[in-house]
């Protein structure tokens, strides 16, 4: 059988982000990610999100306009859910429980009626980087690509953004995300921490008021706040 030649080098990524991350793409760990990805494709293993959406977070969020980073863990592993944006699902897909709680908090915090769509693309286009720590997953196998090296890539992104930008907001939800705090310079950026929005979290995400706190900070540093309504 002829080998499939899809590989990460062929997947579209915004030019500004490509330059920003150029050094990372040459590192040994990233070459290993590419090798693992190609091996999986050649074994006809279904990977989410689809190849053209793996770098969707970067393609929708302009680097020059980045304001907020919302860190997720890994993509949804059920069909038709993962779209390369943390917590987001495509239009007309049932809203997952964690995203339902995010929408509840938006209502509590900013009186925004819960959206009928779970597509968070409008946030990304305003400068919200919806970044999963792990950028791919095998179908029906949660965290199946956690050993590939994606965390090293996403950690490098967080650290580089912290070093080279100022006045960003990092939303860290749950213990996994909170562990990334050491990568961020809290003298230059706002770090907002809360429980994970999952209904399984022991302590509540609801009441954290991260969305209003983020917008207050953005105004304070002279940036346009985010319109959190889903469009």
Swiss-Prot record:
EC number: 3.2.2.27
Protein encoded by which gene: ung
Function: Excises uracil residues from the DNA which can arise as a result of misincorporation of dUMP residues by DNA polymerase or due to deamination of cytosine.
Catalytic activity: Hydrolyzes single-stranded DNA or mismatched double-stranded DNA and polynucleotides, releasing free uracil
Species name: Campylobacter jejuni subsp. jejuni serotype O:2 (strain ATCC 700819 / NCTC 11168)
NCBIfam families: PRK05254.1-1, PRK05254.1-2, PRK05254.1-4, PRK05254.1-5, ung
Main location: cytoplasm
Keyword Iron-sulfur attributed: no
Keyword Transport: no
Protein name per its UniProtKB record: Uracil-DNA glycosylase
SMART domains named in the record: UDG (SM00986), UreE_C (SM00987)
HAMAP family assigned: UDG
Pfam families, per database record: UDG
Active site: residue positions: 74
GO annotation, biological process: base-excision repair, AP site formation via deaminated base removal
Family: Belongs to the uracil-DNA glycosylase (UDG) superfamily. UNG family.
Subcellular location field: Cytoplasm
Alphabetized UniProt keyword annotations: Cytoplasm, DNA damage, DNA repair, Hydrolase
Molecular function terms from GO: uracil DNA N-glycosylase activity
GO annotations of cellular component type: cytoplasm
């Amino acid at each position: 059988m002829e080998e499939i030649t899809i590989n990460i080098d062929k997947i579209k990524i915004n030019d500004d982000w490509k330059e920003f991350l150029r050094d990372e793409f040459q590192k040994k760990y990233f070459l290993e990610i590419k090798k693992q990805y190609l091996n999986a494709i050649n074994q006809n293993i279904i990977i989410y999100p689809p190849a053209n959406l793996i770098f969707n977070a970067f393609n929708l969020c302009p680097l020059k306009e980045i304001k907020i980073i919302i860190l997720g863990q890994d993509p949804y592993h059920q069909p038709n859910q993962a779209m390369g944006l943390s917590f987001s699902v495509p239009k007309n897909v049932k809203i997952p429980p964690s995203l339902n709680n995010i929408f509840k908090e938006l209502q509590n915090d900013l009186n925004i009626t819960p959206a009928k769509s779970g597509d968070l693309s409008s946030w990304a286009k305003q400068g919200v980087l919806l970044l999963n720590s792990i950028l791919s997953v095998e179908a029906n196998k949660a965290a199946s690509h956690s050993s590939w090296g994606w965390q090293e890539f996403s950690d490098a992104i967080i650290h580089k953004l912290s070093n080279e930008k100022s006045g960003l907001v990092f939303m860290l939800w749950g213990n996994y995300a909170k562990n990334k705090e050491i990568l961020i310079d809290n003298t230059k950026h706002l770090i907002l921490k809360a429980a994970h929005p999952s209904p399984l979290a022991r302590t509540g995400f609801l009441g954290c008021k991260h969305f209003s706190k983020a917008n207050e900070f953005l105004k304070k540093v002279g940036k346009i706040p985010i319109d959190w309504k889903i469009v």
